[in-house]
């Protein structure tokens, strides 16, 4: 597991990882100290989900541990902290002042299927899905909402102002990629990918092509 990162400025960050059992114990202790009945928080998670293997380890906090510019002025609290549901889903994000800045809601029946999220101080964005688990609507009460229509190798996105974009896809499963995008203004951008799904080239609406060479 990755527990430390160094950025280009020489700053060191410590990544705090927790297991499902640790989070369950923390939830029990918080309930006891608060004088409330502990909620159901299992000590383990299913080892495999529809998204792949799951060892139950989650990122819980990020600390700045070294700053070459300000070595004696390190923060006394994590830069960011993450809260998780009993099912291992991201529930909330807290900033360095311990203020909640993001929250997430999930489908009761389908683990990991996000049905809403909110930035603190903004309206809640909600999602609806079809029977195959694909997003069909993104609902924003204070801005643009979107509908998604799926066909073979084609996704049509329409906003609440009736503007439409079309995504053309190629590939299967995890290698499916958007190879052409028809924008609402009629312009088109195209992309090419290699055999493992990495972007090789992109052509913009003016016909200019940018090529990419992965450093592997």
Language-model segments: what does each one mean?
Residues 1-216:
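Extended charged/polar low-complexity repeat regions
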